């Protein structure tokens, strides 16, 4: 999953191809005993054009849960109505947290009816201008920067709890850059946030392309994780490069290098409650909705 500041703006991708969506429900078991969910960033272009219709198609595919990544042209209340009308549930939303007062974002979360308020990217210091400046900001974060990010996460989480919400931190791959002595920014975030207040949404795809194993984190930090992103990438060298020339190439689940069976097996005992498929654009082999169906079928099959 990826970043609110630019990536989360429901960018336009390939036009929707006509696809046949099965309306029958499968009978086999689902991972974690919970029906599959999807991060709506995956179908961001479709949500921009026809949010209500896109949500209905996701429900027809078989998804029960969605995770919001902005509201497109709708208000949070209208967005929630579209989700309800489609027969879907939305337990989590990615919001544009910063050092500013998070109160208005909590109001959005309440209007949407979510339990989890998630930061896609959380940076305490001022960011560079434009995409190039933003990417440079991420790639140049120091250990002290990550300590400030952890302090900001604690502050947001305290305020979220007071507002009746649970804050969660979502990762990319840049947090796993070696800062010296084998320590990473993600290590700092885990160590310096309050386990009772700050929970995590593990983006397993970004962890894996950085050369890390989600299973290791689930076992070392039980009860810190509440959600996961299920995404796949074409196999390549491990990298913490998020947007540069070595950026990993996203693909449909089961077509890349990540085996999610051991990840799901470890996620349940670690306290994970929800899992959301997500795919990084561009969609070159099929439309975003067709990819959403392929991802659903993969997750459903390995349950």
Give the positions of each predicted feature.
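N-terminal secretory signal peptides and thylakoid transit peptides that target proteins
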Residues: 1-18, 22
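Acidic-and-aromatic substrate-binding clefts and catalytic sites of carbohydrate-active enzymes
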Residues: 44-48, 67-78, 94-103, 127, ...
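Acidic/histidine-rich catalytic cores of soluble enzymes
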Residues: 162-257, 264
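C-terminal segment of N-terminal export signals and the immediately downstream linker at the start
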Residues: 24-48, 57
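Hydrophobic faces of well-ordered beta-strands that scaffold small-molecule active sites
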Residues: 34-39, 66-68, 90-93, 117-119, ...
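Active-site acidic/histidine proton-transfer and metal-coordination neighborhood
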Residues: 15, 65, 95-200, 289
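Acidic (Asp/Glu)-rich catalytic clusters
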Residues: 30-31, 55-60, 74-90, 103-114, ...
